[in-house]
Amino acid sequence: MEVRVAGVRKEFARFPALHNVSLTIQSGELIALLGPSGSGKTTLLRLIAGLETPTEGMIFFGDEDASQKSVQERNVGFVFQHYALFRHMTVADNIGFGLKVRPGGTRPSTAEIRRRALELLDLVQLSGLEKRYPAQLSGGQRQRVALARAMAIEPRVLLLDEPFGALDAQVRKELRRWLREIHDKTGHTTVFVTHDQDEALELADRVVVMSQGRIEQVGTPDEVYDKPNSPFVYGFIGESSTLPVRVENGEVWLADRNIGLGAENMPDGDAQLYFRPHDVELLDGCGGCIAGTVIASRRSGGKRRVELEVGGARERIEIEIPAEHPAAEKSRIAFRPRYWTLFRAGDSELPAPKAAATT
């Protein structure tokens, strides 16, 4: 089922939670709505579900305008962060609940509801637990039951609101792999909300990065990580280091130093340089590079994280270097980013012409 959000605006007591949001979700896609608190991601999910109605704009399920239709009319499955299972019902009864409460003409028989519940328990790898109650399950098992319940009604769209947020890190990691496998088996159009970038990048076919009620970027995990189109996306997805620089005649300057990066297609003026701390090339010395004084160094797994003062001690950045590097305090380190992006100073939406990787 294709879902299309067209020019949607949502206000709560005149507070704009979404600003003119448009998005097309292809049939069978697994989409992540990713952003910090207050970005509008949960509001967008609730609008797709029918739990909220848009102030302006329309929401289509296929060619059908679903903007004013209820959750039941849209036939969506919804999975909440805290499971929302009925404590007094067995696992099988929880899964079959959505089918049991259907109107008489569309309600399956008791035997069919049980068959469907057992079938889904097998799919979510919980066979044999149908007679247990939610209190007798682990958090990960409860979330699997919640997903099975959402799928029992054979929804046109499956929606998940931070489904793993209440679980510990190891369980979340296991359930991410499991959810991707379930999606590939069933082919549901699936939208999930998360603030966890690792979760979004690992699970989704495409990631919708949101900030302050707007969509900043939509792309594959590789696209939003490798080609972020705004300072916000660069800073939010993965780790980043940034320096205020100046562009003059196609060259990039930090304070009074030409740092050896070309910006031929960018107009002269102030800019912001972004790069990943691990994507740097260490240099023995250079006439055009970034050089700094070590003010802190710490071991982090197989690497070493180093904090440097650069630009005449006016700026501080972090880079990641091999663990065996001594990086003594007050020593000098020279480096150049391998991959980097320039944004015009003060530009929060669109990138300046982007430089290629250095060599």
Swiss-Prot record:
<feature type="binding site">
    <location>
        <begin position="35"/>
        <end position="42"/>
    </location>
    <ligand>
        <name>ATP</name>
    </ligand>
</feature>
<keyword id="KW-0067">ATP-binding</keyword>
<keyword id="KW-1003">Cell membrane</keyword>
<keyword id="KW-1278">Translocase</keyword>
<dbReference type="GO" id="GO:0043190">
    <property type="term" value="C:ATP-binding cassette (ABC) transporter complex"/>
</dbReference>
<comment type="subunit">
    <text>The complex is composed of two ATP-binding proteins (CysA), two transmembrane proteins (CysT and CysW) and a solute-binding protein (CysP).</text>
</comment>
<dbReference type="InterPro" id="IPR027417">
    <property type="entry name" value="P-loop_NTPase"/>
</dbReference>
<comment type="similarity">
    <text>Belongs to the ABC transporter superfamily. Sulfate/tungstate importer (TC 3.A.1.6) family.</text>
</comment>
<keyword id="KW-0764">Sulfate transport</keyword>
<protein>
    <recommendedName>
        <fullName>Sulfate/thiosulfate import ATP-binding protein CysA</fullName>
        <ecNumber>7.3.2.3</ecNumber>
    </recommendedName>
</protein>
<dbReference type="InterPro" id="IPR017871">
    <property type="entry name" value="ABC_transporter-like_CS"/>
</dbReference>
<dbReference type="GO" id="GO:0016887">
    <property type="term" value="F:ATP hydrolysis activity"/>
</dbReference>
<feature type="domain" description="ABC transporter">
    <location>
        <begin position="3"/>
        <end position="237"/>
    </location>
</feature>
<dbReference type="InterPro" id="IPR024765">
    <property type="entry name" value="TOBE-like"/>
</dbReference>
<dbReference type="InterPro" id="IPR003593">
    <property type="entry name" value="AAA+_ATPase"/>
</dbReference>
<keyword id="KW-0813">Transport</keyword>
<dbReference type="Pfam" id="PF12857">
    <property type="entry name" value="TOBE_3"/>
</dbReference>
<comment type="function">
    <text>Part of the ABC transporter complex CysAWTP involved in sulfate/thiosulfate import. Responsible for energy coupling to the transport system.</text>
</comment>
<dbReference type="Pfam" id="PF00005">
    <property type="entry name" value="ABC_tran"/>
</dbReference>
<dbReference type="GO" id="GO:0102025">
    <property type="term" value="F:ABC-type thiosulfate transporter activity"/>
</dbReference>
<keyword id="KW-0547">Nucleotide-binding</keyword>
<keyword id="KW-0472">Membrane</keyword>
<dbReference type="InterPro" id="IPR005666">
    <property type="entry name" value="Sulph_transpt1"/>
</dbReference>
<keyword id="KW-0997">Cell inner membrane</keyword>
<dbReference type="InterPro" id="IPR050093">
    <property type="entry name" value="ABC_SmlMolc_Importer"/>
</dbReference>
<dbReference type="InterPro" id="IPR003439">
    <property type="entry name" value="ABC_transporter-like_ATP-bd"/>
</dbReference>
<dbReference type="GO" id="GO:0015419">
    <property type="term" value="F:ABC-type sulfate transporter activity"/>
</dbReference>
<dbReference type="InterPro" id="IPR008995">
    <property type="entry name" value="Mo/tungstate-bd_C_term_dom"/>
</dbReference>
<dbReference type="GO" id="GO:0005524">
    <property type="term" value="F:ATP binding"/>
</dbReference>
